[in-house]
Regions:
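Short aromatic/hydrophobic "clamp" motif used to bind/position activated sugar donors
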Residues: 94
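Catalytic core of nucleotide-sugar-dependent glycosyltransferases
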Residues: 212-216, 222-255, 287-288
Length: 321
């Protein structure tokens, strides 16, 4: 086996004592013909997360490489994966898995590396994920009936969030860190998905090889399980609209293909209209600049915007009751 590290796995953990063993077992049980490392940041957990990580560090010192924080870095606005873990990584490829999710296929890394090693034009390889509702215990695949295939740029940029889960990503090191012009928070790995697809193809494997725990304490799904207020919906849509405007400028400056620019323009215009609907109501589509933008959208995007109008009207009626 070559001594060079081929894959660096980046893992963030905070108060994950109920879940972290599953994540660590998924890491150390990988069967590969190459070396890999797991860089895991414990963000000053107040439970036993750090102690559990230390157990695995002692047992698998060549794999588990922890960083134990004495002060919580996330609360200080630090991007842990970009600023702490990635600079220490050595791998040709980068994988991600948060401490409350886990891998459920011991051949996951080998399958993805095998694909990328034989297809240099690809920026990343991703796969299907099982969603696990921690409130009910129910689970289901993120996608049903899919086949192995390439993800088009249009479908990647069309999604409101990434069209694959974070725990499924294996990408080439050079495409992991998003440039500052495209950095954004609040909607998962959508910016990273778009950036990777701008720089190469993304191959999707139908195999379910990871599990995403939903509604764990402190998770995004737990924080957003209740209906958001009108102001929260506006703030969320504004963040997305700001990002797609950044993306529009970035693509223009980078001189991407007309096909890609058209896809980005369509999405940015859709987001602009959805923000206008939230701020001014559906009637804003009937006149002024919004009408012109709406008429220029593809049929698919027009339907999307009209769905927003219907959903917002229904939500407002319910809030008044």
């Amino acid at each position: 086996m070559n001594d060079d590290v081929v894959v660096s796995v980046l893992c963030t953990a905070y108060n994950h004592e109920k879940y972290i063993r599953s994540a660590l077992d998924g890491f150390v049980n990988q069967k590969t013909n190459f070396r890999y490392e797991v860089l895991i940041n414990d963000d000053a957990s107040t439970d036993h997360t750090a102690a559990i990580i230390a157990e695995y560090e002692a047992k698998y010192p060549d794999i588990i490489k922890p960083v134990y924080q004495t002060e919580n870095q996330y609360s200080k606005g630090v991007s842990i994966t970009k600023s702490i873990l990635f600079p220490q990584s050595k791998g040709k490829y980068t994988a991600i898995c948060e401490g409350d999710d886990y891998w459920c296929d011991e051949n996951k890394l080998q399958k993805q590396v095998d694909f990328l090693e034989s297809h240099e034009e690809y920026a990343a390889c991703v796969h299907n994920t099982r969603l696990l509702d921690c409130r009910t215990g129910g689970s289901w695949p993120m996608y049903k009936g899919e086949q192995d295939r390439d993800l088009t740029f249009k479908e990647v940029v069309n999604y409101s969030a990434a069209c694959f889960h974070t725990s499924s990503i294996l990408c080439r090191r050079e495409w992991f860190c998003i440039p500052d012009e495209l950095r954004a928070n609040g909607f998962g790995d959508y910016p990273r998905a778009v950036y990777m697809r701008l720089n190469g193809k993304i191959h999707y494997l139908k195999d379910i090889m990871s599990v995403y725990r939903m509604f764990t304490a402190g998770s995004w799904t737990a924080r957003n399980q209740n209906n958001a207020s009108k102001q929260q919906r506006i703030c969320s849509q504004k963040a997305r609209t700001d990002f797609t405007e950044k993306l529009r400028r970035y693509c223009r400056e980078q001189g991407v293909t007309p096909e890609y620019q058209k896809a980005v323009n369509d999405v940015a215009n859709r987001d602009q209209l959805q923000l206008a609907v939230l701020q001014k109501g559906g009637r804003c589509l009937l006149h002024g600049p919004q009408l012109g933008i709406f008429m220029g959208l593809s049929l698919e995007k027009k339907i999307h915007v009209l769905d927003t109008v219907r959903t917002e009207s229904k939500t407002e009626r319910n809030e008044k009751r």
